[in-house]
Design a protein with these regions (language model features):
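Active-site helix of classical SDR
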Residues: 120, 156
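The beta1-alpha1 cofactor-binding region of Rossmann-like NAD(H)/NADP(H)-dependent oxidoreductases
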Residues: 37-38, 59-71, 102
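Conserved glycine-rich cofactor-binding loop
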Residues: 12-13
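C-terminal helical subdomain
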Residues: 173-176, 180-181, 195-232
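Conserved glycine-rich Rossmann-like NAD(P)H-binding loop of the short-chain dehydrogenase/reductase
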Residues: 26-43
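Residue(s) in the substrate-gating loop at a strand-loop-helix junction
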Residues: 140
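Substrate-binding pocket helix/loop in short-chain dehydrogenase/reductase
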Residues: 96-97, 104-106
Length: 232
């Protein structure tokens, strides 16, 4: 029986790191990427203390089409298939619309939206050919509820939800399931304020890995995940 193979983007810290941890605990191999080589190396050292043979990583700019294609091609060459893709890589710039630079807008869209498109497009043919696979796009409740100063971030997450829904319709007939996770406030370095009420990265990771337990006939195409007590 073949190993369960997963790819996680933005996997060196925060939600992505929690997803990598959770997938490794389930068994199988995990390939993750992040933009910073230093961040990748640090996470890989820590993870290999417990999982020396089952986790692999590269520094990849998901907004670079050629880097994404090379990364996925290498995984497919090594493993022959990909069972699960988690598109988690993301950045944020927050400023009033008239103070948001074009450069910041483009960089954010390149990472948050283009990167997810490139990754899905790269894994889809192999998943379709195999007749199964799971793609999870980590969006945000900010993709449904705009916030002041969040023009670029909101737009990227609205776009990611739309992209995810369309990909779901494209791929479901071939046994490939596409789901969007919409977390509320999560306690990560990305978050601007602390708070015990916030979701933890492990909460999001548990939701994502839980999708692997659904029968093939069931497709949770969107999941909204909120803190219980307050906030979004």
């Amino acid at each position: 029986m073949s190993q369960h193979i997963s790819i996680v983007t933005g996997g060196s810290r925060g939600i992505g790191r929690a997803v990598v941890d959770a997938l490794l605990r389930r068994g199988g191999r995990v390939y993750f990427c992040s933009l910073s080589q230093e961040s990748v190396d640090k996470a890989l050292r820590e993870l290999r203390r417990i999982h020396p043979d089952d986790v692999f990583a590269q520094a990849v700019d998901v907004g670079d089409e050629s880097q994404v294609e090379a990364f996925v091609a290498e995984v497919l060459e090594q493993e022959g298939h990909v069972d699960c893709l988690v598109n988690n890589a993301g950045i944020g710039y927050f400023a009033p619309i008239d103070e948001l630079s074009g450069e910041d807008w483009r960089r954010l869209m390149r990472t948050n939206l283009d990167g997810s498109f490139y990754m899905m497009r790269a894994v889809a043919p192999a998943m379709r050919e195999r007749g199964e696979g799971l793609i999870v796009n980590v969006a945000s409740l900010a993709g449904r509820h705009p916030m002041k100063g969040g023009a670029a971030y909101n737009a990227s997450k609205f776009g990611l939800i739309g992209l995810s829904d369309a990909a779901m319709l494209d791929l479901r007939g071939d046994g490939v399931r596409v789901s969007a996770i919409l977390p509320g406030s999560v306690a990560t370095e990305f978050s601007s304020s602390a708070g015990d009420w916030k979701l933890q990265p492990e909460d999001v990771a548990r939701t994502i890995t839980g999708l692997l337990d659904f029968p093939a006939r069931a497709l949770p195409s969107r999941i909204e995940l909120r803190p219980t007590s307050t906030g979004r």
